[in-house]
């Protein structure tokens, strides 16, 4: 099976960007509580 590198990159970005966004919001909320 041929692996499409662009597809892998697209999936990686699609997963990592929202995850990073949620982590940033989570950290912001914690620092505000402190």
UniProtKB/Swiss-Prot annotation:
One of the protein's GO biological processes: photosynthesis, light reaction
Protein name in UniProt: Photosystem II reaction center protein M
Protein localization: Plastid, Chloroplast thylakoid membrane
Superkingdom as given in the UniProt entry: Eukaryota
GO cellular component, one term: photosystem II
Broad class of the protein's primary localization: plastid
Assembly information from the UniProt record: PSII is composed of 1 copy each of membrane proteins PsbA, PsbB, PsbC, PsbD, PsbE, PsbF, PsbH, PsbI, PsbJ, PsbK, PsbL, PsbM, PsbT, PsbX, PsbY, PsbZ, Psb30/Ycf12, at least 3 peripheral proteins of the oxygen-evolving complex and a large number of cofactors. It forms dimeric complexes.
Signal peptide: none
Annotated transmembrane regions: 5-25
Function: One of the components of the core complex of photosystem II (PSII). PSII is a light-driven water:plastoquinone oxidoreductase that uses light energy to abstract electrons from H(2)O, generating O(2) and a proton gradient subsequently used for ATP formation. It consists of a core antenna complex that captures photons, and an electron transfer chain that converts photonic excitation into a charge separation. This subunit is found at the monomer-monomer interface.
Family per similarity comment: Belongs to the PsbM family.
Keywords recorded for this protein, A-Z: Chloroplast, Membrane, Photosynthesis, Photosystem II, Plastid, Reaction center, Thylakoid, Transmembrane, Transmembrane helix
Record-linked InterPro entries: PSII_PsbM, PSII_PsbM_sf
Membrane topology according to the record: Single-pass membrane protein
SUPFAM superfamilies in the cross-refs: Photosystem II reaction center protein M, PsbM
